[in-house]
Amino acid sequence: MANRSHHNAGHRAMNALRKSGQKHSSESQLGSSEIGTTRHVYDVCDCLDTLAKLPDDSVQLIICDPPYNIMLADWDDHMDYIGWAKRWLAEAERVLSPTGSIAIFGGLQYQGEAGSGDLISIISHMRQNSKMLLANLIIWNYPNGMSAQRFFANRHEEIAWFAKTKKYFFDLDAVREPYDEETKAAYMKDKRLNPESVEKGRNPTNVWRMSRLNGNSLERVGHPTQKPAAVIERLVRALSHPGSTVLDFFAGSGVTARVAIQEGRNSICTDAAPVFKEYYQKQLTFLQDDGLIDKARSYEIVEGAANFGAALQRGDVAS
């Protein structure tokens, strides 16, 4: 029986477009000069309050690194946590554009108490109660981590990528990894392979080998669970297009905003912790001091939830 997964449906749609001489939105490329001024709004704000202020179909990508029910949070029990998560998941689905995606970071509570909330709980809920598609489960594999004596030392974290519809945006070319020269030369001689695809590089797969930030990392701004910019960059480049809006309502360290500025996207970043504003400003300083931003790229920083609309005015549906 033929595999009728949404992945194959997407390939068939892409091939049909190419035969007719058309291009899918994920094949378009915009230079920095075409993006114009991007806008970046931030505030200290609860996730549900943030989402309530946003219109339907208004953002392209949501980066989501939620707190988990691991005895460190203020939920009374597992059902309280899941009930809370269901509310922001439903709102996230509402605000995503038809081509949009949400990338949810999380871990598995291997030896936690029965019923502890983790990414499995969220995936299970989404598969049973949402129309969104589980496009990929990404394994972030890192070499550095805690040692262990009673179990195999953990060296990975999961990222669940859900797409709102089968029309989701995905720009593989933006995140391809180059082949080494020896492999590239061998592949170019293989008549079964497309030379253009070989030239572009390999699909990075859903296993991403990237180090976590250590205590001495220059990226660190003080947040205890800060994610490396490289991980966020790959998500932003692959799942959003230049000029679109990236939302992060558990923004923590503020790294999503920094990456959005670098990549020519608009952003809305909020967090319930008052210290978030301090982290956000550190990210901006890091960006400017280290020359990570294209000098030709223009961006504006706006504080306050009342200004969310400023980051949405460019629109988000790739066409």
From Swiss-Prot:
Class of enzymatic activity (EC top level): transferase
Residues annotated as signal peptide: none
Activity over temperature: Optimum temperature is 37 degrees Celsius. It has about 60% activity at 30 degrees Celsius, the optimal growth temperature for this bacteria.
Stored CDD domains: AdoMet_MTases
Record EC number: 2.1.1.72
Catalyzed chemical reaction(s): a 2'-deoxyadenosine in DNA + S-adenosyl-L-methionine = an N(6)-methyl-2'-deoxyadenosine in DNA + S-adenosyl-L-homocysteine + H(+)
Name of the encoding gene: rsrIM
PROSITE patterns: N6_MTASE (PS00092)
Lineage of origin: Bacteria, Pseudomonadati, Pseudomonadota, Alphaproteobacteria, Rhodobacterales
Record field: pH dependence: Optimum pH is 7.5.
Protein family (similarity comment): Belongs to the N(4)/N(6)-methyltransferase family.
Annotated keywords: DNA-binding, Methyltransferase, Restriction system, S-adenosyl-L-methionine, Transferase
Keyword S-adenosyl-L-methionine belongs to the record: yes
Name assigned to this protein: Type II methyltransferase M.RsrI
Organism annotation: Cereibacter sphaeroides (Rhodobacter sphaeroides)
A Pfam family assignment: N6_N4_Mtase
Activity regulation, free text: Strongly inhibited by N-ethylmaleimide, inactivated by MgCl(2) or MgSO(4).
Biased amino acid composition, Basic residues: 1-10
Annotated segments matching region Disordered: 1-32
GO molecular function: DNA binding; N-methyltransferase activity; site-specific DNA-methyltransferase (adenine-specific) activity
